[in-house]
Amino acid sequence: MKHTDIRDCFEKEELVGSKLTVCGWVRTSRDSKNMAFLELNDGTTLKHLQIVIDKGSLTPDAEALKLGASLKVVGTLVNSRNNSVEVNAEEIVVLGKCPQDYPLQKKRHTLEFMRSMPHLRTRTNTFNAVLRVRSVMAEAIHDYFQSRGYVYVHTPLIT
């Protein structure tokens, strides 16, 4: 089964009630006796998709509940109480485990801290939002000049 972007789960009403597969990284997890809740993000949107795990029918691997783990979740997309959507998980596959010393946690990190880890910056909401704004601005600038007959030229680098 082909995976569905998390962005599409929020934007396409026709997906509600259907069985789908989503892949992403665990942003937060809450665990109780009978239920577990994960928030999954795949980078296609700033929103996080809540995954509901009924422990009576599905026992998640402990690795799946760790912040930063990469998962594939198969389940049914349903409307949630807060006018959003969530996935009732039927199957969870851990695609990538997260090391014990994973530096990103639930709390907000300073820009100084993130400067020391450029490979993880895009996993934060701040840098994700900055990249999206820059993308929209660059597209608008290119469209403006293209519509006026300008040609975009990649100049050679002089070293």
Predicted regions and their residues:
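Class II aminoacyl-tRNA synthetase catalytic cores and aaRS-like
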Residues: 1-159
